[in-house]
Structure formats: C-alpha cells, structure tokens
Amino acid sequence: MMEFLKDFQKMGIYLAYNVNVDAIVYLNEKHIESLIKEFGAENIKKRIDEYPREINEPLDFVARLIHALKTGKPQAVPLVSYEADKWFNSRFKYDFERIGGQVGVIANLLANLDFNKVIAYSPLLGRKQAEMFVNRDNLLYPVVENGKLVLKKPLEAYREDDPVKINRIFEFRAGTKFKLGDETIEVPYSGRFIVACRFEDFARIETSPELKPYLPEIGEMVDGAILSGYQGLRRYYSDGKDANYYLRKAKEDIKLLKKKKDIKIHVEFASIQDRELRKKVIYNIFPLVDSVGMDEAEIAHILSVLGYRELSDRIFTYNRIEDAVLGAKILLDELNLEILQVHTIYYLMYITHNDNPLTEEELTKSLEVGTTLAAARAFLGDIKRPEDVKVGLNIPFNEKGEYVKLRFEEAKAKMRTREYKIVIIPTRLVRNPVSTVGLGDTISAGAFASYLSLLKRKE
C-alpha cells in the first residue's frame, strides 16, 4: 500500500463534472418516529407501495427513507420540487456540511494523498463549494485568461453568482429500531439515504465553451481522468435542449481529453432512475472510456437495459456472486470496456480481458488500495494526510471474506473465464463508521489511481 503513495506523488488526475455541498443528518429513533407521527403510518405504507422514483412532496421522501431503512441498502432519490426543497430546510437541522459529488469527494481525497496535480472541474463553482475544497497547492481549477489555460486554486476561481447545489444525506446505523404502525423495524445495515437535488441549473453536464478547446492540453498534463455526474442529466430542458445534446458534448470532451495523449478515462457510474436516460448514458459514454465503476445494483440496472432481464432480476433478488460475475462479463464485452470495477458491501471485483498487462496479483493489490482507503475514511470520517491510510491497514477484512472467496471459486469453476482476468477481494469493514458517504467514490478513485500507477510501472 505505502509504495503506491510514493507513485501518487508523481501522478496527475483530471476530474469532472459534479461538485455539490452535502448537508448531513445522523438519523436516530426520534427523527424517524417524528416523521412517522407527522405523516401517518398508513399513508407512508401506501406511498411505499407506490414507490415514488422522485421526490415531489415530503411524503415521497418519508416513504423512500423508511424503505431504505427496512432494507439497510444505500439509496439516492432525485428531488425535483422547489417546495419540497424549502421543507427540508425548515424541517431539519443538519449535523454538518461538507463537499460532495464525486468530483468534490475524490478531489479532496487525492489532494490529501499528495498527488502531484489534481485538476477538478465543475461547470458551476459557487463560493460555498470553492471553500469546501481543501486549500492545497496541488488542487486546481482550470480557467482561461487572456487566451491561455490557467490553473488556479478553487478559492481564486469561484464565481459569486454561480448557484450552489445542496444534497441532503441521511446517515443511518445498523440496529436502529422503530415502529411503523404495528410493524417493528430494525435497520439491518449502516448506510445512507441521499436526497439528490436535480434542479435544471445543476443538470447541464458540459465543459464551458471557453475551456473546451484546452481539454487536449489538460489531457497532456495528467495520467488519467475520472468523469462522473451523468446521473444529473434530464430528458428535456426548458431552453429546448435535451439529454442527447449534452451527451454529444460529453462525448466530445472524452475525445478531446484523449486527443494528444491517450490517457485512461474512468467513469464512476451512479444510479439513474429514468430507464431511457440510463440507456442513453450507457450506449453513448461507456464505449468511449476505459474503465467503469459501479455497485451490484447498478450492474442489474444496466443488464436490464441491455435486455438481460432474467439475470438482472436474479442479481436484485438473490445478490449472488456468480450472477454478479456473469453480469460483469456481459458488461465488459458488450460495452467494449478495458476493465470493470464492482464495489459492494462485502467484496470488490475487477474483471478485464486476459491480454491486460497487469497480473491477477497486481489487480488484487489495486483493489486492496481501494478498500484500505475506504476503511480509513469510514473509521476517521475523512482522510487528511497520507499517514491516515495506515488506519485502514489495521481494519480487518469483513467476516464474510472466506465465504466470498469460496463462492467466487465455485463461480469460476462453473463458467468460462479463460479469456478473462477476474479478481475478488473481501472489503475491510468498519463496524460503526463515522460516515458512509463517499465510500464507493473513495474505493473507485483509489483502485483506478493504483491501476494507473501499476500500468505506468510497465512502461
């Protein structure tokens, strides 16, 4: 692990597109009981059955929150109503606020790990967001001045009039108990429920026209790029533009980043509720990039779009490793990826083709970087310096580790894997995490960065 930290000091990464502020509430029994009393158990149960896919009113939020607590699975649901947005501000006192969005989380992480250069871009950069980036010389925001590309600290580059996106995050703990009518519910796993702000101002995934011509120059400065935020896209916009317009722009960005130097590009995929939008992102973006990261639920969502409904349903219903491996093989081949990274509560997986220059042992080391960083973040709440990583090394692999390895070996024996390199490792699991927000992003960033460093060693 520590040898990777030395490599990171010589590496540069470009990040785009989504930065926001996370307003975090640590849920307890009183919060939950108060919401149930306010909205009524029967009303909540009825709305849970309707399963709203976006939050138009507070009852939609309460229903989806209770559903997340019952399953213990992390969920994110888009907030689309300005009235509901005001209700959250009047109803909840936030425990604290910090930078969010994949770009925000990953930028601060990599800067604190002493990467040589972290270039973080978001189409909007308000003052509050700029203040939440760590104030370090290696974390920079690209601007154009006098016809030249200039890299500035975010605090020197923000725009006073840019709106700030706020996501509300409700952290819940395993073992929390509450009553919903006659039903007693105990939360099975720690996790978080995200109310993801999806207003139109924040749904434009693009590089500014001024900066766009300089993307090839940025590509030359870095070893790789991590792109995210596509989950914010809308089908249609009030000015007549649509998702296809922004996806065309996003494809241009990828090609420009690779124009002068064929850098590796990773996409961190987040849940897209709208099936048609999900399909558009998958078919437009994935074939142009090298690496994609996701969890097993997102594998199932994508398989459904690709026409593998039965396998998708099996992953949702049974959560078996063998189904996840089969699904990952399909995604790797159908979407022309170099490598697919899967992160779940109990295991991490890489799948790539047999001609990948890295050995299975090296791929395993890369995944271990991801889970070690995530464990350190879960235990400490944040990683503020390279030495914090040692905390993660002292956290044991989860108790299902041996079972995970056994099921993986059984899965490999049953299916054709000769053309692939597939590695799975158990996760290091913190029993009472300070926070679960950003752990998937931390895993993906750590794994992708270490993957790049291992490839560089082969050059």
From Swiss-Prot:
<protein>
    <recommendedName>
        <fullName>ADP-specific phosphofructokinase</fullName>
        <ecNumber>2.7.1.146</ecNumber>
    </recommendedName>
</protein>
<dbReference type="GO" id="GO:0008443">
    <property type="term" value="F:phosphofructokinase activity"/>
</dbReference>
<dbReference type="InterPro" id="IPR011790">
    <property type="entry name" value="ADP_PFK_arc"/>
</dbReference>
<dbReference type="InterPro" id="IPR007666">
    <property type="entry name" value="ADP_PFK/GK"/>
</dbReference>
<dbReference type="GO" id="GO:0000287">
    <property type="term" value="F:magnesium ion binding"/>
</dbReference>
<keyword id="KW-0479">Metal-binding</keyword>
<feature type="binding site">
    <location>
        <position position="298"/>
    </location>
    <ligand>
        <name>Mg(2+)</name>
    </ligand>
</feature>
<comment type="similarity">
    <text>Belongs to the carbohydrate kinase PfkC family.</text>
</comment>
<keyword id="KW-0963">Cytoplasm</keyword>
<feature type="binding site">
    <location>
        <position position="441"/>
    </location>
    <ligand>
        <name>Mg(2+)</name>
    </ligand>
</feature>
<dbReference type="GO" id="GO:0006096">
    <property type="term" value="P:glycolytic process"/>
</dbReference>
<feature type="active site" description="Proton acceptor">
    <location>
        <position position="441"/>
    </location>
</feature>
<feature type="binding site">
    <location>
        <position position="268"/>
    </location>
    <ligand>
        <name>Mg(2+)</name>
    </ligand>
</feature>
<keyword id="KW-0418">Kinase</keyword>
<dbReference type="GO" id="GO:0006000">
    <property type="term" value="P:fructose metabolic process"/>
</dbReference>
<dbReference type="GO" id="GO:0005737">
    <property type="term" value="C:cytoplasm"/>
</dbReference>
<comment type="pathway">
    <text>Carbohydrate degradation; glycolysis.</text>
</comment>
<keyword id="KW-0460">Magnesium</keyword>
<comment type="function">
    <text>Catalyzes the phosphorylation of fructose 6-phosphate to fructose 1,6-bisphosphate using ADP as the phosphate donor.</text>
</comment>
<keyword id="KW-0324">Glycolysis</keyword>
<feature type="domain" description="ADPK">
    <location>
        <begin position="1"/>
        <end position="457"/>
    </location>
</feature>
<dbReference type="Pfam" id="PF04587">
    <property type="entry name" value="ADP_PFK_GK"/>
</dbReference>
<dbReference type="InterPro" id="IPR015990">
    <property type="entry name" value="ADP_PFK/GK_arc"/>
</dbReference>
<keyword id="KW-0808">Transferase</keyword>
<dbReference type="InterPro" id="IPR029056">
    <property type="entry name" value="Ribokinase-like"/>
</dbReference>
<dbReference type="GO" id="GO:0043844">
    <property type="term" value="F:ADP-specific phosphofructokinase activity"/>
</dbReference>
